[in-house]
Swiss-Prot record:
InterPro entries: Calcineurin-like_PHP_ApaH, Metallo-depent_PP-like
Protein name per Swiss-Prot or TrEMBL: Shewanella-like protein phosphatase 1
Molecular functions (GO terms): metal ion binding; phosphatase activity; phosphoprotein phosphatase activity
Protein's job: Phosphatase which plays an essential role in the development and differentiation of the ookinete and in the formation of ookinete micronemes.
Comment on bound cofactor: Binds 2 manganese ions per subunit.
Length: 362
């Protein structure tokens, strides 16, 4: 903590002694961020992680907002053959991307993350990978904003002690802070961009790695804007965690919003954008701009649907893009696929699958 404070003092002293006119304000921050990262690297090499050019030759599975619903998550992972009956990873050469918002509303956010971190380690042994993206609800928790936390979660996983939970998320040495702060807000895999909230013409002036780094640094700065950065506020609705103007408006102004989308995709040399955050009222994956823009927050959590889960996932395999919808029921006699979940609750689901092809129309 002392090292961190001293580092910021040195940075601000540097700014104070720079003569006016020596350089433009917008040109200062790259040097400052570079030196900040070099110093912090001594403590945490994750500041140098790059997410702007990940190459993957196998299948990709993308999952949207979970909001504490571990049953929907496990139904997806079982159906897509990523985990077995014992909840261990079994998928060969598969990339799983979870697009943020694991926490809040539901109860099981903490054990979902523990489970996903476990799968990250297991997947490596199967030539697979799990990428977890930061959502705005992860950011809210890291910033100490707990308005969406289910009280039952505090009771079950934090000894019914809100202060204990606060320490776990807000204190830099807290159990969940240490792990969640490393999650990237934005990732590019092949020609696909994944981010939680969305993109806009303003934020897309920055590189993926700059967005990830500066979003993290603002959270570490007590979630306050960093004064010497020209963009200022990465936790606002202009930042990738919250930006939803495109996803909210594209159903009504598709031509205009798709024009913006393709400008942004060209900037990043990408063809597709996958976002969560904006709940789809149909409980199915939304697709716009000739299947180049996918909205995968289907409001799946049973905690927001009176106990009814709506699990969906995006599957990309052999250049084929499909939305997979799982129609879930509890039936004694199941004419479809029966999936037995054993933890945290022993429950049997009858699952019917519906797939929609989402490749662009040529």
């Amino acid at each position: 903590m002392i090292f961190k404070k001293a580092l910021y003092i040195l940075l601000f002293l540097y700014i104070a002694i720079v003569k006016k006119g020596e350089s433009k304000p917008g040109s200062k921050h790259p040097f400052l961020f570079k030196n900040l990262v070099i110093d912090k690297k001594k403590l945490d090499s994750s500041y140098y992680n790059k997410y702007d050019n990940i190459k993957w030759n196998g299948k990709i599975i993308a999952i949207g907002d979970i909001h504490g619903d571990i049953e929907s998550l496990k139904l997806i992972l079982r159906h897509s053959k990523l985990i077995g009956e014992n909840d261990n990873w079994i998928g060969d050469n598969v990339l799983l991307v979870q697009n943020g918002d694991v926490f809040d509303r539901g109860i099981y956010g903490p054990i979902i993350y523990n489970f996903l971190f476990k799968l990250q380690k297991e997947a490596i042994k199967k030539n697979s990978r799990v990428i977890l993206i930061m959502g705005n609800h992860e950011q809210l928790n890291l910033c100490g904003y707990f308005n969406y936390v289910n009280p039952k979660e505090i009771e079950m996983f934090f000894h019914n002690d809100a202060n204990y939970r606060y320490h776990s998320f807000v204190n830099p040495y807290g159990e969940y802070h240490k792990r969640l702060i490393r999650l990237p807000p934005m990732v590019k895999v092949n020609n696909i961009i994944f981010t939680h909230g969305g993109l806009n013409l303003l934020i897309s002036k920055l590189s993926i790695n700059d967005i990830n780094l500066k979003t993290r640094l603002q959270i570490e700065n007590n979630c306050k804007p960093i004064k010497y950065d020209s963009f200022q506020n990465y936790l606002s609705r202009d930042g990738v965690l919250w930006s939803d103007a495109m996803s909210r408006n594209v159903p009504y102004y598709e031509k205009e919003k798709c024009s913006e989308l393709f400008q942004i995709l060209d900037k990043y040399d990408a063809k597709y954008l996958v976002v969560g955050h904006t709940r789809q009222p149909s409980h199915q994956i939304g697709s716009y701009c000739n299947n180049h823009y996918f909205l995968i927050d289907t409001g799946m959590s049973l905690f927001t649907n009176y106990g009814q889960p709506y699990p969906n996932y995006l599957k990309i395999d052999d250049h084929k893009i499909k939305a997979v919808r799982l129609i879930v029921e509890k039936k004694k006699k199941c004419p479809h696929t029966e999936i037995q979940l054993n933890t945290p609750n022993k429950i049997k689901y009858c699952v019917q699958e519906s797939q929609t092809n989402l490749n662009p129309v040529l």
